[in-house]
């Protein structure tokens, strides 16, 4: 049976993610902060919630920045929400925080005064929104273009390499909702909270060989 390591650095919605992975038959799901267990896993999931400064402080304290760079090179790897944002170069949250730098780009604040069709939009962006699929990636298998996923975020990703944007969203501004590079895939939305489409994405991840 394959193993899926859900990285625990104290800042993620870990049990919801693990339960969703178990629900789709992903194999043996381990919530762990043990580097050796993470290295031995067949697949790795990197969730995250909260302030990026606190997340990156814990990631660096545990040495997980180097570990994430290592394990995401040679096996299917999924970043979720702030776990996705931590993979970028830099976030302007908390007066500016350097991140892991696996994907080029910046994490930016939606800002006050966000307007769409004459209406003021609330920040954080919270609720269901469409994701426009840019390419035919294996993790989109059996998920229709413009399927709706569940988002909760005040900061959005401005990708530095548009070829890595495999899904985009719009909330006053266009933003990267999904990024991919080799065996790495990352999403701004919460698949574990996104019902049918989110579970399908996790099922696709569980079956993916990491090639694209």
Curated annotation (Swiss-Prot):
UniProt domain Glutamine amidotransferase type-1: residue ranges: 3-212
Entry's Gene Ontology molecular function annotations: glutaminase activity; imidazoleglycerol-phosphate synthase activity; lyase activity
Active site per the UniProt annotation: 81 (nucleophile), 190, 192
UniProt keyword Lyase present: yes
Principal location: cytoplasm
Pfam families according to UniProt: GATase
Record flagged with keyword Amino-acid biosynthesis: yes
Alphabetized CDD domains for the sequence: GATase1_IGP_Synthase
InterPro entries attached to this UniProt entry: Class_I_gatase-like, GATASE, Imidazole-glycPsynth_HisH
EC number(s) from the headed UniProt entry: 4.3.2.10, 3.5.1.2
GO CC annotations on file: cytoplasm
Subcellular location: Cytoplasm
Functional pathway: Amino-acid biosynthesis; L-histidine biosynthesis; L-histidine from 5-phospho-alpha-D-ribose 1-diphosphate: step 5/9
Catalytic activity, reaction form: 5-[(5-phospho-1-deoxy-D-ribulos-1-ylimino)methylamino]-1-(5-phospho-beta-D-ribosyl)imidazole-4-carboxamide + L-glutamine = D-erythro-1-(imidazol-4-yl)glycerol 3-phosphate + 5-amino-1-(5-phospho-beta-D-ribosyl)imidazole-4-carboxamide + L-glutamate + H(+); L-glutamine + H2O = L-glutamate + NH4(+)
Coiled-coil regions listed in the entry: none
SUPFAM superfamilies, alphabetized: Class I glutamine amidotransferase-like
GO biological process: L-histidine biosynthetic process
Keywords recorded for this protein, A-Z: Amino-acid biosynthesis, Cytoplasm, Glutamine amidotransferase, Histidine biosynthesis, Hydrolase, Lyase
PANTHER family given in the database record: IMIDAZOLE GLYCEROL PHOSPHATE SYNTHASE SUBUNIT HISH, IMIDAZOLE GLYCEROL PHOSPHATE SYNTHASE SUBUNIT HISH 1
Subunit relationships: Heterodimer of HisH and HisF.
Function: IGPS catalyzes the conversion of PRFAR and glutamine to IGP, AICAR and glutamate. The HisH subunit catalyzes the hydrolysis of glutamine to glutamate and ammonia as part of the synthesis of IGP and AICAR. The resulting ammonia molecule is channeled to the active site of HisF.
Protein's name according to its UniProt entry: Imidazole glycerol phosphate synthase subunit HisH
Organism the protein comes from: Pseudomonas fluorescens (strain ATCC BAA-477 / NRRL B-23932 / Pf-5)
């Amino acid at each position: 049976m394959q193993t899926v390591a859900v990285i625990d650095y104290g800042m993620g919605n870990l049990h919801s993610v693990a339960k969703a992975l178990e629900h789709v038959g992903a194999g043996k799901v381990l919530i762990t902060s043990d580097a050796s267990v993470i290295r031995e896993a067949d697949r790795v999931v990197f969730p995250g919630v909260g302030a990026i400064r606190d997340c990156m402080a814990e990631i660096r304290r545990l040495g997980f920045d180097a570990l994430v760079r290592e394990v995401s090179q040679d096996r299917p790897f999924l970043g979720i929400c702030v776990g996705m944002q931590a993979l970028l170069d830099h976030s302007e949250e908390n007066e500016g925080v350097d991140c892991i730098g696996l994907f080029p780009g910046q994490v930016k604040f939606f800002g006050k005064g966000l307007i769409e069709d004459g209406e003021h939009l609330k920040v954080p962006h919270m609720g269901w929104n469409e994701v426009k699929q840019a390419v035919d990636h294996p993790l989109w298998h059996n998920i229709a273009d413009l399927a709706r996923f569940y988002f909760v975020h005040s900061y959005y990703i401005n990708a530095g390499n548009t070829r890595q944007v495999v899904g985009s969203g719009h909330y006053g501004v266009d933003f990267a909702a999904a990024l991919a590079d080799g065996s790495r895939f990352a999403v701004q939305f919460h698949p574990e909270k996104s019902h049918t489409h989110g579970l399908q994405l996790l099922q696709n991840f569980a079956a993916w060989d990491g090639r694209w």
